Amino acid sequence: MQRTIIDYYLDEEGDWVALLSCQHGQHVRHQPPFVNRPWVITQAGRDAMLGSGLNCVRCDRLELPDHLVLLQHLECRDGDMPPELRAGLATQAGVWTRILVQEGQLICHLGEPLANRLIATPLAELMIPPEVLYSIESDPPPSFILEYYGPQRPS
């Protein structure tokens, strides 16, 4: 899945890492002849690449970035599911959705670029990357927890 470069930082070994709009970090090394990224060497080169896309395999694998914090926690029980979950919604850049089914079963439809149908049963966890349209269907209504994770907000 293509994600936008929003920033850079150095890892513990001094290698550049691109921070993507999904909040995953991806190394952007210049190691010819294997990896040819001369732009990473200079500040001007890195700045020129801000806003460009990189493929994020961790989003493809639905992996929540480790450094995110819980932003919101909602418990949905006995059919009180927010209507926008049935109609379809997508979170903003950097905000992940976690669904934990407690009772019943739900089906989650993920839009492009993932285009997948996930079935969740009790104690199953679904992770939905930022900016991916998703909708939920179920009959009968399940009980589940809906959580949103994102970067730590300044205090």
Question: Where do the model's predicted regions map?
Answer:
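Short beta-strand-initiation
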Residues: E13-D15, G94-W96, T121, E131
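Short acidic-glycine-tyrosine-enriched beta hairpin
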Residues: P113-E131
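Short, conserved beta-strand element in jelly-roll/cupin
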Residues: A93-C108
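Short, surface-exposed charged micro-motifs
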Residues: V17, R98, S135
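Motif-centric detector for short Cys/His coordination patterns
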Residues: M1-M81, L85-G88, L106-H109, A120, ...
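Residue-level marker of beta-strand positions
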Residues: G25, L106, A124-M127, L133
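Glycine-centered tight beta-turn/hairpin loop motif at sheet-sheet or coil-to-beta transitions
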Residues: S21-Q23, P113, P141
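Ligand-binding loop in jelly-roll beta-barrel domains
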Residues: P129-P154
